[in-house]
A protein has these predicted regions:
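Gly/Ser-rich, low-complexity
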Residues: 1-72, 88-97, 107-177, 216, ...
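Hydrophobic alpha-helical transmembrane segments
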Residues: 67-79, 196
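Membrane-water interface regions at transmembrane-helix termini and the short interhelical loops
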Residues: 81-94, 182-186, 214-215
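Alpha-helical transmembrane segments of helical membrane proteins, especially in multi-pass transport
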Residues: 174, 178-210, 224-246
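Elongated alpha-helical scaffolds
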Residues: 102-105
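Membrane-embedded alpha-helices of multi-pass transport/permease systems
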Residues: 75, 120, 127, 184-187, ...
Length: 288
């Protein structure tokens, strides 16, 4: 009778250990996959992300918004010329050199406006290059290896049947948290790209104000916003990398129950921080 009881207990322990390891291995595989996937998604340029949407945005920008921006530039340049002519005692002390300065300034403004789309894409090319380089370093340093899981399995084998059953039930909760994390990452990554497309579609209008002394702040703030949303991808990647390192430390801590709830806590923290990356990026670049 004791032999049968021991056999049944060992069989149940092996079953529960297998279930717990399956849940946690699925988690670690998911974490590794997410770091790699996010590195790809946030490191993708608008042109490469979706060619159809990119083509539509470019056509709208160049055929609908650019003519309006041309009118804005005309008004801004004319207004600045009138101001320049009147500010020197109603032209009594006017310097002819100012006309050449105005002509040069206006020519630069026209050049910038006609190359608006290339300038905007250059911003995202720079951020994409940085994110791609960082993604390779981060992904390589946060992989959760099979050796780490073997250490965890060894600690599980020393536990009794009751704690193992409770741990298996708790580990099942991880699937729900990972599902929620996947939704948050999807919304954030895809929402960021849609924001990039929206910013790009109206780019000529703020760029038309860059050369003016008084309203040039609009164009400067627009450029800051572009850099902020571009490098937001870097902050997203860093958040996920920190999460992966923290999970890596939990898995190898030797405390399976603490690992389960630690992962849940870190997942909630990650979701919270991911939504703050946009605001942090704007503060870094002074955009508002």
């Amino acid at each position: 009778m004791d032999f049968l009881t021991d056999w049944l207990t060992n069989w149940l322990k092996e079953l529960l250990i297998g279930g717990i390891m399956g849940n946690l291995e699925g988690l670690t595989d998911y974490v590794n996959a997410q770091v790699g996937e996010i590195a790809v998604q946030v490191g993708t340029t608008p042109a490469a992300w979706n060619a159809g949407v990119f083509s539509l945005i470019r056509q709208l920008s160049e055929t609908v918004i650019l003519p309006i921006a041309g009118l804005v530039l005309t008004f801004v340049a004319t207004y600045e010329l009138i101001q320049m002519l009147l500010e020197k005692n109603n032209m009594h002390e006017f310097d002819v050199a100012n006309i050449y300065k105005w002509m040069f300034k206006t020519a630069c403004a026209i050049l910038i406006l006609s190359n608006t789309f290339n300038i905007v894409m250059a911003v995202f090319d720079v951020s994409q290059s940085v994110i791609t380089q960082a993604g390779g370093l981060i992904q390589g340093s946060t992989d959760i290896t099979p050796d780490m899981m073997t250490e965890l399995e060894t600690s599980l084998e020393g536990m009794d049947l009751g704690p193992l059953l409770g741990l298996w039930l708790q580990s099942s909760i991880i699937g729900v948290t990972m599902w929620a994390l996947g939704i948050v990452i999807f919304v954030l990554v895809y929402g960021r790209m849609l924001e990039i497309y929206l910013l790009t579609s109206l780019a000529p209008i703020p760029m038309a104000t860059l050369a003016h002394r008084e309203v040039g702040q609009t164009g400067q703030n627009y450029l800051r916003s572009l850099f902020a949303v571009g490098f937001q991808g870097m902050l997203i990647l860093v958040c996920v990398a920190i999460y992966a390192v923290l999970v890596q430390g939990i898995v190898t801590s030797g405390d399976p129950i603490g690992a389960i709830w630690g992962i849940v806590g870190y997942t909630v923290l990650l979701c919270f921080m991911l939504f703050k990356t946009g605001g942090i990026a704007q503060r870094i670049f002074g955009a508002h």
